[in-house]
């Protein structure tokens, strides 16, 4: 086998591979003879079909099957010999004639080689959130609202009321698609409508009509409406006031709590603290990763981005329960491209840093992280034992421990400032971030 390496711009190169004719023809001949012993053909007994007949009828097909198997073997050997770190590969067949050498080109995209420096340029704003009894009470009130009963009242609309409305949305004076609805129930202050919409209903009475002006968010999914100033003609048809259940032993049983109200409040606070800890870690980590992407200079392999896009599509399909009749591949790649590119770049950067630093996940550290994570489950010890039996889950935990250590290592060199934030705003931002990333 003859191999010629041709380097191209950036992370691209090609391998021109030539396989001797006698090697190809020998394998094809053996395959034809093997096929002749098993194939059935009219006029011949089983195993007695002449090889020449098989070659005449199936020779081209057999040759292509042989080549399809042989090509990956040959370029894999060439890649190994040349010591190339390949991210993606495309094969282009050049010459394929009987009695002639097989020639093909393997167009390669390589993993970039780079060193990350300038960690002191990374700026991180570390959120500081104080969790007080006030936030715990508000969380309990939110849970009470889930079991609220509503009764019609004849007063002006206030926060937490449920209103039944008709509305017509207009842009530049013309009604836009999807902007008209009748008999829609909206709980004021729930955030189910775009910012400003629910506030515009406060103070209205039953039967009242009103036109409000609202601006759609810049990141709204409908690009025709994103950032657009619109009006809504609103008619209030019904106003209902919420009545919240008392926080007593009967109420807390709805959440599987057996120890009464005090136990319930303690569990709520512990859950809030646990959730807050992981969200704040994620916020800091996201800033660190963003900073790393800004200081690291390299070309991102498109093949890796494409692979990540395909994985994101399959993940979306899984989230939709494998929706029948829905072809996820019909979704445009650019819908996923930005997130995919960020994930690939972050992964490459972390790998680069870990190759230069010795971060290890000690068994005690993995155990400690596992203990924290399982507290969110109803049966922590049972869940812990199940996870410990799963090698993949343990590998993920080890990777998370190392990722946390790497993040702390970067933070020691970065410019870190603190910013006081509200608990519920942090939770809201986290939910929005998760939705944006599918």
From Swiss-Prot:
PROSITE patterns: FKBP_PPIASE
EC category: isomerase
SUPFAM superfamilies attached to this UniProt entry: FKBP-like (SSF54534), Triger factor/SurA peptide-binding domain-like (SSF109998), Trigger factor ribosome-binding domain (SSF102735)
EC number: 5.2.1.8
The keyword Cytoplasm belongs to this UniProt entry's keyword annotation: yes
Main location: cytoplasm
Gene Ontology CC entries for this record: cytoplasm
InterPro entries named in the record: PPIase_dom_sf, PPIase_FKBP_dom, Trig_fac, Trigger_fac_C, Trigger_fac_C_sf, Trigger_fac_ribosome-bd_bac, Trigger_fac_ribosome-bd_sf, Trigger_fact/SurA_dom_sf
UniProt GO BP: 'de novo' cotranslational protein folding; cell division; chaperone-mediated protein folding; protein transport; protein unfolding
Catalytic activity line of the entry: [protein]-peptidylproline (omega=180) = [protein]-peptidylproline (omega=0)
Protein localization: Cytoplasm
Alphabetical keyword list: Cell cycle, Cell division, Chaperone, Cytoplasm, Isomerase, Rotamase
PPIase FKBP-type domain: residues covered: 160-245
GO molecular function: peptidyl-prolyl cis-trans isomerase activity; protein folding chaperone; ribosome binding
Domain of life of the source: Bacteria
UniProt xrefs under NCBIfam families: tig
Notes on the domains: Consists of 3 domains; the N-terminus binds the ribosome, the middle domain has PPIase activity, while the C-terminus has intrinsic chaperone activity on its own.
Reported function: Involved in protein export. Acts as a chaperone by maintaining the newly synthesized protein in an open conformation. Functions as a peptidyl-prolyl cis-trans isomerase.
Family in the record: Belongs to the FKBP-type PPIase family. Tig subfamily.
Protein name: Trigger factor
Species whose genome carries this gene: Francisella tularensis subsp. holarctica (strain LVS)
């Amino acid at each position: 086998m003859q191999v010629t390496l041709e380097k191209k711009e950036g992370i691209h190169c090609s391998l021109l591979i030539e396989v001797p004719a006698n090697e190809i023809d020998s394998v094809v001949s053996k395959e034809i003879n093997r096929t002749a012993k098993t194939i059935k053909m009219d006029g011949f007994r089983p195993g007695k079909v002449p090889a020449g007949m098989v070659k005449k009828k199936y020779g081209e097909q057999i040759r292509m099957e042989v080549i399809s198997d042989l090509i990956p073997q040959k370029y894999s050997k060439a890649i190994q010999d040349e010591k190339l770190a390949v991210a993606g590969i495309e094969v282009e067949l050049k010459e394929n004639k009987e009695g002639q050498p097989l020639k093909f080109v393997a167009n390669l995209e390589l993993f970039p080689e780079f060193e990350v420096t300038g960690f002191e340029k990374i700026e991180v704003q570390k959120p500081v959130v104080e969790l007080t009894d006030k936030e715990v009470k508000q969380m309990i009130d939110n849970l009470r609202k889930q079991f609220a009963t509503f009764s019609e009242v004849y007063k002006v609309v206030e926060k937490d009321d449920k209103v039944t409305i008709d509305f017509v949305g207009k842009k530049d004076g013309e009604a836009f698609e999807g902007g008209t609805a009748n008999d829609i129930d909206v709980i004021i202050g729930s955030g189910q409508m775009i910012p400003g919409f629910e506030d515009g209903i406060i103070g209205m009475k039953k039967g009242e009509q009103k036109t409000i002006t609202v601006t759609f968010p810049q990141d709204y999914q409908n690009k025709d409406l994103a950032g657009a100033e619109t009006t809504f003609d609103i008619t209030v048809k019904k106003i209902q006031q919420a009545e919240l259940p008392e926080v007593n032993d009967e109420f807390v049983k709805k959440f599987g709590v057996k120890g009464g109200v005090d136990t319930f409040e303690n569990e709520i606070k512990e859950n809030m603290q646990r959730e807050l800890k992981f969200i704040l870690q994620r916020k800091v980590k996201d800033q660190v990763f963003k900073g790393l992407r800004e200081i690291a200079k390299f070309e991102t392999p498109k093949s890796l981005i494409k692979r990540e896009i395909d994985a994101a599509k399959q993940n979306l399909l899984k989230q939709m329960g494998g929706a029948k009749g829905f072809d996820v591949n019909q979704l445009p790649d650019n819908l996923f491209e930005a997130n995919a590119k960020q994930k690939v770049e972050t992964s490459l950067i972390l790998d680069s840093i870990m190759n230069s630093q010795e971060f290890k996940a000690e068994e005690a550290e993995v155990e400690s992280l596992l203990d924290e994570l399982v507290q969110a489950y109803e049966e922590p010890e049972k869940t812990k034992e199940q996870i410990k039996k799963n090698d993949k889950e343990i590998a993920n935990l080890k990777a998370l421990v190392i990722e946390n250590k790497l993040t702390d290592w970067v933070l020691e060199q970065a410019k870190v400032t603190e910013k006081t934030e509200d608990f519920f705003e942090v939770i809201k931002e986290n939910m929005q971030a998760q939705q944006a990333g599918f």
